[in-house]
Amino acid sequence: MFNCFLLNNESIIFTIMKSEEDFVETHLKEVEGASIWESPSNIALVKYWGKYGTQYPQNPSLSFTLSKCITKTSISFAPKEIKNRDFSFDFKFEGNNSPAFHPKIQTFLERIDCYVPFVRQHHLKIESVNSFPHSSGIASSASAMSALALGIMSM
């Protein structure tokens, strides 16, 4: 599908609607590498009260980006030694092994698997640090998942 729009009688903006297949990596490659990404956090002024479905909020919320409060996530990756369909990763938060975060990371990887199937072929070493205190009311999981997503897309 192809659309064009007239903006202020001066500029034309073109958009091309793509199908889901356009986003799926079909050339599976086993490589080694690393990436580092930073993502800003946010703080809610009007908080949402729960979710339904696949991460849809029950009600609207209002939040502000805190550009100085960042999560920095590094991902190093290499082909897995044992070939199987399981995700393979280690996670450190603030320099410490943090298995409590594994279920959230596992769920995230399962949700994006159809778009980045090559991730299953690699072992990931994920390390994350915040420039702000954890559990302080600042949305650290949002910035952490953003930085993780950017890192995976850089593989």
Regions found by a protein language model. Give the residues of each.
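Short, positively charged and aromatic/hydrophobic N-terminal segments
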Residues: 7-8, 12-13
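Short amphipathic alpha-helical face segments that pack within enzyme cores
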Residues: 143-151
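Active-site nucleophile and cofactor-binding loops and adjacent substrate-binding regions
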Residues: 138-140
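ATP-binding N-lobe of GHMP and related small-molecule kinases
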Residues: 14-136, 150-155
